[in-house]
Amino acid sequence: MAYNFVRSYIDTFRERTAAISHTSTFRETGQITPEEFVLAGDFLVFKFPSWQWGDASSAGKRVPYLPEGKQYLMTRGVPCHRRLDDNFAGEAGQDETIVGDGFAGSEGADDDGWLRTGGMAASQEAKVRDVRTVDESGNLGAAEEEDEIPDMEDMDDDEEAIIRDPQGGSSSTAPLRTYTLYICYSAHYRTPRLYLSGYGATSVPLKPQEMMEDIVGDYKDKTVTIEDFPFFEHALKTASVHPCKHASVMKVLLDRADAALKLRLAKLKAGKDIGKLDTGMEGLVDDTRLLKLSEQAKGKEGDEAKDDWEVLSEGGDDEVAIRVDQYLVVFLKFMASVTPGIEHDFTMGV
């Protein structure tokens, strides 16, 4: 506890005395400038209206390097139905596994993968594409080939597609909690920083130790600490994800997304069917490229809109998968690994 207090004091001092850089190093370091933070925030608010800009409660709480009225981003009422206890993922809930992104040659690079909590035995290798079916008796089916995956539009009336509650089984659903998420800019680390404020089913604010129940075990009191939200006069206790590793992780994600994009473009040139992926880095590329398409095709119809697909499909070798204004979309997907019980996608379905 004393250590966390000292670290919070040091962090506050660093934020107040940090030299502000206006030189973009987004691609090289994973860091962003205040101007890029505002650009990414405007994109997030535009694409996902549940997010909005907020202002400091008083002029004395504002930071000079961000515009008035755009001091931080916030979204309210994000649901959290489950606690991160042993019931979160059954017996496998105690395991944490690094999930690779599916690229060849990435074995052993655990530090660069995604942290997955539960769902796999310790002896299993995590493969994002190894998806199998489970029947009502709990028996694991054989792995499906890609060409056997059914079209979701054909499953509307398929009773076999209905997920049924196991009879007599215990539910992992806990009393509903909701969270207000805040994204601020860290001047010292030059990255976004996430703050979470939780509320119980009756809208009573959660105590700090209760909010920690929704944080992945290894992050508690290490990467995630209880902090006062910096833009309010009154003390609002929040769980905050420390940004010391954000830039390096974001750099890895950006590089891997670029590699996934190059892989997809190579497949297109070779005439291969790439389909639509929902997981891994190629799935993330799909999501961000859909965002690009919706921007370019907005207000266009017919052949003109069709041309946008061709432009996206025939991008040059120097095309990047994720632009700087899409930074916060990727950042929130990264933050979801710290709080998997909080439904971040509730705020930003692509």
UniProtKB/Swiss-Prot annotation:
GO terms for biological process: autophagosome assembly; autophagy of mitochondrion; glycophagy; nucleophagy; piecemeal microautophagy of the nucleus; protein targeting to membrane; protein transport. The active site is at C244 (glycyl thioester intermediate). Keywords: Autophagy, Cytoplasm, Protein transport, Transport, Ubl conjugation pathway. Pfam families: Autophagy_act_C. Residues 143-153 have a biased composition (Acidic residues). Residues 126-135 have a biased composition (Basic and acidic residues). It is found in: Cytoplasm. Residues 126-153 are annotated as: Disordered. GO terms for molecular function: Atg8-family conjugating enzyme activity; Atg8-family ligase activity. It comes from the Eukaryota. Residues 248-326 are annotated as: Handle region. One of its GO terms (cellular component) is phagophore assembly site. InterPro entries: Atg3/Atg10. The N-terminal region is involved in phosphatidylethanolamine-binding and is required for ATG8-PE conjugation. The flexible region (FR) is required for ATG7-binding. E2 conjugating enzyme required for the cytoplasm to vacuole transport (Cvt) and autophagy. Required for selective autophagic degradation of the nucleus (nucleophagy) as well as for mitophagy which contributes to regulate mitochondrial quantity and quality by eliminating the mitochondria to a basal level to fulfill cellular energy requirements and preventing excess ROS production. Responsible for the E2-like covalent binding of phosphatidylethanolamine to the C-terminal Gly of ATG8. This is Autophagy-related protein 3. The lineage of its organism: Eukaryota, Fungi, Dikarya, Ascomycota, Pezizomycotina.
